[in-house]
Amino acid sequence: MLICVTNRKLCKDDLLTRIAQIAKGKPHGIMLREKDLTVIEYEALAFVVNKICKENGVPLIINQNVKAAIKLKIPDIHLSMDNLRSFKNELELAGFSQVGASVHSIEEAKEAERLGATYLVAGHIFSTDCKKGVPPRGLQFLKEVCESVTIPVLAIGGITRNHIDEVAGTGASGVCIMSEAMTCANPAALVNQFRF
């Protein structure tokens, strides 16, 4: 399972072109991160990205912006633990089909599952420029998260092709990649390169 996470600041070319190339490779989802955009800017971008994703049969995952997901009728959302706790009632009312949560401890993983998350993203597993100066949590942490819940767990943070076997050995269901997705030479080939 592969989820590609956007970050236009890492993207060396046009973000929409790159998203279209990634979507052609059919990952399990494309998560629209872009946390620094205003709500209006995010909604406008999500509208266009959703069209690209639909054309390619790839789910768009809205990151954090519950109101945009509801407004655009996008059924997949990814939340921080704080937002998962805050929006629990709204999530139930909105009827999202997939609710992901970012977790950084075993306790958070268990809580997220109790609150209704359908999958978890655990990290950061390896060193990454996105979290400079913060030590990675490592494979043992990932294994413990996987063992503590019954829902799928994806690894994030410093994931490269060279890590796939190690990550798969922890019981994880897949990976989320951002830097590689935004900078690689052949975005359409990512799914095959990160296959478990």
Which residue stretches match the model-derived regions?
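Hydrophobic faces of well-ordered beta-strands that scaffold small-molecule active sites
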Residues: 2-6, 30-32, 60-62, 77-79, ...
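Short, acidic/polar
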Residues: 9-23, 64-67, 104-111, 160-165
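Glycine-rich, proline-tolerant flexible connector loops at the mouths of alpha/beta enzymes
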Residues: 31-41, 124-131
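Alpha-helix-loop-beta-strand connector modules within alpha/beta enzyme cores
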Residues: 42-64, 81-84, 88-105, 133-161, ...
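Conserved, mostly hydrophobic/aromatic
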Residues: 4, 22, 30, 69, ...
